[in-house]
Each structure stands twice: as structure tokens, then as C-alpha cells.
Amino acid sequence: MVDKGIKKIPVQQLRLGMYVHEFSGSWMEHPFWRSKFLLRTEDDLARVVQSGIKELWIDPAKGCDVAGGVSVTEVRKEVERELEFAASMPLPLDTAESTQAALAKATALYRRSVPRIASLFSEARLGRAVNAASCTPLVEEISESVMRNPGALISVVRLKQRDDYTYMHSVAVCALMVALGRALGVEGDALRQIGLAGMLHDLGKAAMPLEVLNKPGKLSDDEFTLMKLHPERGHAMLVEGGGVGPLVLDVCLHHHEKVDGSGYPHGLSGEHLSLFAKMGAVCDVYDAVTSVRPYKNGWDPGDALRKMAQWKGHFDTRIFQAFVKTVGIYPTGSLVRLQSGRLAVVMAQNPTALLTPRVKAFFSLKSNLRVEPTEIDLSSPWVQDKVMACESPEDWPFKDLDRLAGLLAPR
């Protein structure tokens, strides 16, 4: 967000005549097709307040103003401080395999996973009992991939296509849960259960009408209310099918709860939520907002973390900090601006220094031209360059960032 004059205000200060620039929260959690509009009617004002949104950005240049509020610059500085603090947390996880080798194996696993998850959802949609045990081999494969290189599978599944989102979201959240679990010190069978919970957390969507689940547009209020039933539907399916433990059931039922008590289905606050449900909330939202959906492109991974850091009351602070450490302040595939006046795409994390990833510079801001792609390890003592800021891909005409990052094979 580079707009000058934009300010963040609590929803209690919202008035008719204000120009809403952006809601502070996931675009999945509000009933508006557009996030930028002039607030003209009492009905729209009531819908914003009733949606549970706590804060939002307004543009005083396009509508009414209000005293106070927090500027973009102030919010950005606070978020960067929080992310840098999270990056400084110790995380003694060594990558046991090279990035390219891990990416190749992760890509193969990605391709094998789609039909297996699709079959599971199809069986559930037909009303047949869910055989959770059938997922165990796939969870084991995903866990092993994360152990070899935590960033590889997470990066690859981010490239999911619109038509396989529901299935690959299950794989992505499984991988994210395992990686986050390792960061939090979870081991053994508990780690496998966390992975299984991630894979099955959205099973209840198999009970949703396909025309709602795959709707190529924003859901209506009634459709959104229906979709909010999926945690309870999934929980019921898993209980009926048997063979899953309380950890998996807990994550399925409570992954949409928030620590401030404003989530669903039960409105539980932080002290009533388990570690695993809080993990599920972070992993589910991160993958959802960074994924391409039928009606919206995904956010850049770096942008997603920075926006999530602003959503006070959504996530457990300790878990979110560990998550940032897990995926990196500059996740693979992110677009960054270097001190040298170049744009670069992040290729891999430096596990011991998240502020200095390995990048590929490919564009000169001085000449405004593409240059020969050059790999740079920013952690090297011989390299004087550094990341100055994340850039939003939406502000640039680049269509090949994932290919430059090494996530896709050359054409």
C-alpha cells in the first residue's frame, strides 16, 4: 500500500460519506464484492459493522475524514518491527537437501496429491464414510518433504490453479502445519496428527453446494452464512467416519476461530482455543489469501504476512511469530527492491538470517529495463546489497516471477 493520506481507523469511527480504501482483514471475511467504495447508505454501513471487521483504511481525499487514525507509514513501521522481531527468534532447523532437488521432489508430490485428495472429497460428497486412515501415507510423504526442505513444498503448492484450489489447499495447509509444528517443537506422532489435521480441516466443504463452493464471484450474505457451516459439517463427517483423534477433530471444528472471540462457529477466545486450533487458523488464512481464487488473485506472500500482522485479535502472537520464521519475512516467490536499485525475486530462505535470503535480480529501477537475471546470496559477507522493501507484483507488469524464482521449469 503506497497511497499517501490513507489512514486506518476503528470501525466505530466509520461514517457515511467516507471512502473505504481497504478492509483490515481477509477478503474472505466481508460481504463486499469491492474493497474500495464510497459509503453511501445506512444499509452498507450496517453490513460493514455487522461483518465483524474491527478496523479499515479510509481515503480522506475521496470522502469524509475523521480526527485521529493511523497513517500508512506508522502502520508499516510497526509491522516491519514486528516481523523483524519474529525473524530474530531462534529456529534451529537445518535444510537437509538442496533447494532445486527438494523443489523437483515437491513438484512430483504436488502432482500425485491432487487426485488423491479429490477422491477423498468426492467420497465425502457422495455421503460415504470418510476413511481418514487412507490419508496417512500422503501425510507421511508431505511430512518427509517438509523435513527435507521446509520451503520447497510450501512454495510449490502456492502455484495451485483455480480449478484445483480446494484439494491443493488441503495439501498446502498440511505442509504449513507440519513446518509450523516443527518450529514450535512438536515431534513424533503429534506432528503427524498436525499434518492430518491440516489435510482434513476443510473436509466440510464437501457438504457445500458446488455452485456456492465454486462460485466465480463474491458470495451473497446467505451463501456466506451457509459456507460458515463447513467446520461443523466436517467435524460431523470425521466423527461419523471414526479413526481420527481429538487433535484432528479440534482443528477441523475451530480453525476459523480468532483469539479475540470474533471467529466462528463458537466465538471462542484465545484462552479457550488449543495450540493446534490456533496453528490451523494461521496456516489456513495464509494459504487462502496467497492463492488464486475463482474471483480474486492471491496476494504476494510478503504482502500477506504484512497484512496479517496488522489484524489485531485474529491470531495468537507467539504462533504468528513462529509462522513468520517458518515461511520467511520474504517468502520464496516474493518481489523485493534491493539497495542497489534493482528488483529481485526471492529464490530461497537463509534459515539463520531471514533478512538476507537468496534472490535473483532481474530489473533495473535506474534504467527501467530488464537486465540479465543474476543470483545473489544476500547473506554472503562479500555481498554489499540488501533488501530495502517488499514490492507488490500488482504494481509491475511481470508475469514470470515464479519461473524466475525457480518454482517452475524453464519454457
Feature locations, PLM:
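Histidine- and acidic-residue-rich, metal-dependent catalytic cores
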Residues: 103-411
